[in-house]
Amino acid sequence: MHFNGIQSFKKWVCLSIASMGLVACGGGSADSKTAAASGANNQAAASGASNAGKEGQTINFGIINTESSQNLKTDWEPFLADMSKKTGLNIKPFFASDYAGVIQAMRFKKVDLAWYGNKSAMEAVDRADGEVFAQTINNDGTTGYYSLMIVNADSPYKTEQDVLKDAGKLTFANGDPHSTSGNLVPGYYVFAKNNVDATKIFKRTLNANHESNAMAVANKQVDVGTFNTEGWAMMEKKNPDIVKKLKIVWKSPEIPSDPLVWRKDMDDASKQKIKTCLMSYGSTPEEKKVLDALGWSKFRESNND
């Protein structure tokens, strides 16, 4: 299946979630306790959110937890610094320990815009009054990526069916519950379609971010884990020796590239500055280098449809 945008993906999500017996689409809320902790840790960065739009005012940019905070800071700080220069706004990063922390921070106006995966973007639109305004384009020019199931290179398993047959003996590293490629997509294609529950079929199931899962599989701390092609490409650059220790046993249909979401009630002046900056960013060698560290080449316009 190919998804044309967030709405077609959302329709699929609603059907797949129903088939997995999980909560219905829309409504509900992310973990407020996580958000409260994340908000407290980021209180200083959030102090200027309500005054966005004026020269030098603070805009808080939420970044989902796909790898360690230190790695995220290293990759994101040059981009956010460029955004600040080009917009005249003070763009500050907002990191949380999980995806729910960023969603809830947007809901309570501690975050003005954010980089999400498709599932977390849908939740931000439904629960945090968010609005999709842009989509990333990969550094190879494509606008999609894939969920993966990985095992150690020494593992005898070659397919997801091999893994499922021996699941009762194995430890499984699942993704963040709000992750599209780390949890939702494999949850449907690997588990729901085979009429099994990932939380029950394995000897033990853990939840972590993409980087942590890959490292755990490579170091034989777990037997199998979820990952994605974006993370794989990043790891080939940063930790090629780790990638050599991994083997792919399952690959999903294509998932749309990641959306950027801002709060609907952000002032129009700030929205225009941010959109103008992003739609032209990536045209110089310096900008291309900054985006390449994030796995992207440029941005294109998008919306909730």
Q: Which role fits each region the language model picked out?
A:
Residues W115-A128, Y189-A192, A218-N219, D223-V243:
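A ligand-binding cleft/hinge motif common to bilobed small-molecule-binding domains
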Residues G21-A24:
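C-terminal motif of bacterial Sec signal peptides marking the signal peptidase cleavage site
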Residues A100-A114, R127, Y145, K165, ...:
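Short helices/loops that flank or line small-molecule/ion binding pockets
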